[in-house]
């Protein structure tokens, strides 16, 4: 390949990289449309519309799920929304009206973590195209509870220690004064001054200890039915209560109360370098060079903090829950084993 083609290829590569960078940084829709990477729906003659959830028709509390909308035009060509659908249709050209679930500007649905907000309801979305009242897609979204839920009430991690300050470099010694080497008038050059020592680096600070995991209390009641559900409320001092609905046939709830990790010790500062000795002055004889100063010692690294202690977990459950206790799991490592208390528990909401 001759030099001319090499230069041309470089220009093309640089231009393509610059365009890609501009699109990545600005997300410029106009550029994407100009390049044919996106299409405005108003420029198409579409006849059908359909909505779907590629990750499955149902959602669990706390889950997100991308929405995909598909169109067919008069020629039979299929057009799909951007994002999860990897298509060209812009979400900004559509109106998505959600119920129970929420939706963001990229067509991603979300069901609230708190099951009380969706209890006894199904999610619903309606997709319409402004200016085209004949195009409408509706989608019902059942709520599922047969998934692994988890809640962590762990202690806070310790703070990291401060790094030590670096030592100061020593100053260089002064050069010796000049003598002379003239016949009958020789004089010795002066000795160079010694460099000063570098100072020691500061010690790193110790890392803070991790916080203890709090004592956790779990209340569990049974909601009877053709497919029984476990109502659970998990609480800890100073923490917001967490609510769960769990289908024990496939679902589970894991409760964690571990101590926070200790913070890392700070690094010791580097010792300062000794100053160089000054040069001996010229003369007959020349002066001696000064001695270089000693380097300072590096500071000691700080000690890591200790991990916090793991919290206790107490599970209070209604007698009707006992056959389903295998769906309740705990993790508090070396802390005492969870305490189980069987006593009547009324419906929790």
Each predicted region: which residue ranges?
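Extracellular/luminal low-complexity segments enriched in Ser/Thr/Pro
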Residues: 103-118
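Short flexible loop/turn segments that cap and initiate beta-strands
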Residues: 72-100, 231, 249-251
């Amino acid at each position: 390949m001759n030099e001319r083609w090499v230069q041309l290829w470089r220009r093309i590569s640089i231009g393509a990289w610059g365009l890609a960078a501009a699109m990545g940084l600005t997300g410029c829709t106009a550029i994407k449309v100009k390049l044919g990477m996106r299409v405005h729906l108003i420029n198409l003659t579409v006849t059908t519309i359909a909505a779907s959830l590629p990750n499955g028709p149902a959602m669990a509390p706390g889950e997100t799920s991308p929405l995909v909308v598909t169109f067919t035009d008069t020629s039979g060509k299929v057009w799909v929304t951007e994002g999860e659908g990897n298509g060209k249709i812009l979400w900004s050209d559509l109106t998505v009206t959600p119920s129970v679930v929420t939706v963001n500007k990229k067509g991603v649905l979300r069901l609230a973590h708190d099951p009380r907000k969706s209890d006894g309801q199904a999610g619903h979305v309606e997709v319409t195209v402004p200016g085209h009242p004949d195009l409408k897609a509706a989608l019902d979204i059942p709520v599922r509870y047969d998934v692994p839920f988890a809640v962590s009430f762990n202690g806070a991690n310790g703070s990291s220690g401060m790094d030590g300050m670096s030592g100061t470099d020593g100053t260089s010694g002064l050069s010796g004064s000049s003598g002379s080497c003239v016949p009958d008038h020789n004089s010795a050059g002066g000795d160079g001054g010694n460099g000063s020592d570098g100072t020691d680096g500061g010690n790193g600070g110790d890392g803070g200890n991790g916080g203890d995991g709090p004592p956790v209390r779990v209340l569990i009641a049974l909601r009877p039915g053709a497919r029984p559900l476990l109502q659970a409320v998990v609480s800890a001092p100073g923490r917001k209560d967490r609510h769960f609905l769990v289908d024990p046939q496939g679902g589970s709830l894991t409760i964690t109360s571990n101590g926070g990790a200790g913070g890392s010790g700070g690094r010791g500062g580097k010792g300062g370098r000794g100053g160089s000795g000054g040069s001996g002055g010229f003369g007959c004889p020349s002066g001696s060079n000064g001695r270089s100063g000693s380097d300072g010692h590096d500071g000691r690294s700080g000690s890591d903090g200790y991990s916090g202690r793991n919290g206790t977990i107490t599970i209070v459950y209604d007698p009707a829950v006992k056959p389903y206790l295998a769906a309740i799991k705990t993790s508090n490592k070396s802390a005492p084993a969870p305490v189980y208390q069987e006593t009547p528990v009324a419906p929790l909401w």
